[in-house]
Amino acid sequence: MGFQENKMPEVKRQRPGTMRLVDATQYRLPLAGVVSILHRASGAMMFALLPLVIWLFDTSVTSEISFEVFRSAFGAGIGWVPGWFVKLAVLGLIWAYLHHFIAGVRHLWMDATHSVTKEFGRQSAVVTLVLSVLFTVALGAKLFGLY
């Protein structure tokens, strides 16, 4: 009894609750967090589109005629979807692949070298974003026929 009575009352601290999606705009993520979320989003996007990409690849290599139909989609479009929108969608898929690949290399590098500091995380996040955008612009210029 003596020990229990002398115990100080615990102070209840207000703990943060679970973050809801609608509250996401109130938080300011560091750049490394933004790159991490984009890495996950690009991976999810590629996973969701994988059946379509496999079907398109299979269709394009079936015959020369099917390849020409596939190729004409970039110029004339598909049904009511204009060709520039098809190119824009493909450009989004190109960005997703490049960003996911570069961010994956970043994560592997950090795991292999134990470079887990706030400064390295910020610097490597900047490099990841810059490289993925530069490579996407270069491939997008080729996709839209600029060179």
Label each region the model flagged:
Residues M1-Y147:
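Membrane-embedded alpha-helical bundles that constitute the cytochrome b-like, heme-associated redox core
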